[in-house]
Structures are given as structure tokens and as C-alpha cells.
């Protein structure tokens, strides 16, 4: 009932490792299995993980990661220099729904952007001044994720790509000037 690491997880890790600085205070939103956070631990000042799933939260704790069970980063008052998120970015069709926590980990809502919008709307609250975020998105998302980023006054740069059979995944670095 936890999202298992896949190509998108690897893409986030690669982009995070290129961006990471030793003095970064990092939050990984929706950390799931802890694949990324586990590999960043010890390479930065601190790392906090969040996940909405109690099963993911238990797994993150089991791996020795600091975790807050919450939706995105609700209730967290600290701001972070590096924010990471591999969101659910696909629209899960009704016949594929299982009615469990894995649905929450995979289903990005209509056109795959519901959770991405929620994340972008909360980014000012969790990203420090001169902070950066790395977001994973799909070429299948509508409206275009780049437009959603622009509409919220952020700047962005594609810092990684991965072509799959039916879509292209992007690692997008986001910041404010």
C-alpha cells in the first residue's frame, strides 16, 4: 500500500542530488517508501519527510527518517531551502481504483493536476526565501504544469527528463526571484 520506487522516483533522486548543497534543509513531500530521502540523508543539514498515508509514515519511521503524517506540508511552520515532490500525476480511472492508500499515492485527480495545484499553492509557505523546489510532472498533465507554475509567480527550469512509452516525465526546478 506504499508507492514503490519507479522511473519518476529515480528522476527526482537524480535531480535532487545535482541540486543538493551540504547546508540545505530539505523536505520531501509525499515521500512514500523513502527512496529519495534515504539517499539524501547525511548529505544535507537535515531532511524531513511527509506523507498522507499512515503506511508510508510507518515505513519512513522504520527507515530512521523524520516524518510528519500530513497532506502536503499542512501544519509545518518551518521553511526549507530545498523542497522535493514526486506527486501523484496521473488520473486514475474508476475501474482501476482499489479503495486503499495506494489510490491516494497514484491518483492526481482530474487530468493529473489536482495534487500538483495544491502543492504549488502551498509552496510559498514551505519554501525559504531563495529556496528551490523540484517537482516531477508528466507530459500528460493538463493544464500544462508549466502554465500552473507561471500563474503562481514562480520561475522554472527543466533539470531532468525521462521518456517512457506513453509519456515524458520532467524534473522541474522551481524558485522565486
UniProtKB/Swiss-Prot annotation:
Q: Which residues bind S-adenosyl-L-methionine?
A: 30-34, 51, 86
| CDD domains, A to Z | AdoMet_MTases (cd02440)
NCBIfam families per UniProt: hemK_rel_arch
Query: Is the Secreted keyword given for this protein?
Result: no
Cellular component (GO) terms are: eRF1 methyltransferase complex
Does Iron count among this protein's keywords? no
Q: Which family does it belong to?
A: Belongs to the eukaryotic/archaeal PrmC-related family.
Q: What does this protein do?
A: Putative protein methyltransferase using S-adenosyl-L-methionine as the methyl donor. May methylate a Gln residue in target proteins.
Query: What EC number(s) does this enzyme carry?
Result: 2.1.1.-
| Residues given in the record as substrate binding sites | 86-89
Q: Which biological process terms from the Gene Ontology are attached to this UniProt entry?
A: methylation
Keyword list (alphabetical) reads: Methyltransferase, S-adenosyl-L-methionine, Transferase
User: What is the name listed in the Swiss-Prot or TrEMBL entry for this protein?
Assistant: Putative protein N5-glutamine methyltransferase AF_1784
The protein's matches in InterPro entries, at most eight in alphabetical order, are given as: DNA_methylase_N6_adenine_CS, Euk-Arch_PrmC-MTase, PrmC-related, SAM-dependent_MTases_sf
Q: Which reaction does it catalyse?
A: L-glutaminyl-[protein] + S-adenosyl-L-methionine = N(5)-methyl-L-glutaminyl-[protein] + S-adenosyl-L-homocysteine + H(+)
Q: Which principal EC class is assigned to this enzyme?
A: transferase
- What's a single GO MF annotation on this record? S-adenosylmethionine-dependent methyltransferase activity
Amino acid at each position: 500500500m506504499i508507492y514503490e520506487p519507479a522511473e519518476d522516483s529515480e528522476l527526482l533522486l537524480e535531480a535532487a542530488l545535482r541540486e543538493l548543497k551540504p547546508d540545505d534543509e530539505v523536505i520531501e513531500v509525499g515521500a512514500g517508501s523513502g527512496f529519495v530521502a534515504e539517499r539524501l540523508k547525511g548529505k544535507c543539514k537535515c531532511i524531513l519527510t511527509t506523507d498522507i498515508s499512515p503506511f508510508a509514515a510507518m515505513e519512513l519511521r522504520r527507515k530512521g527518517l523524520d516524518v510528519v503524517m500530513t497532506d502536503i506540508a499542512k501544519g509545518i511552520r518551518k521553511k526549507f531551502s530545498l523542497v522535493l515532490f514526486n506527486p501523484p500525476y496521473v488520473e486514475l480511472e474508476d475501474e482501476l481504483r482499489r479503495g486503499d492508500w495506494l489510490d491516494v499515492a497514484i491518483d492526481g485527480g482530474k487530468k493529473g493536476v489536482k495534487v500538483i495545484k495544491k502543492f504549488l499553492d502551498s509552496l510559498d509557505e514551505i519554501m525559504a526565501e531563495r529556496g528551490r523546489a523540484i517537482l516531477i510532472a508528466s507530459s500528460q498533465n493538463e493544464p500544462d504544469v508549466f502554465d500552473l507554475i507561471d500563474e503562481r509567480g514562480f520561475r522554472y527550469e527543466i533539470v531532468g527528463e525521462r521518456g517512457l512509452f506513453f509519456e515524458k516525465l520532467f524534473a522541474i526546478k522551481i524558485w522565486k526571484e
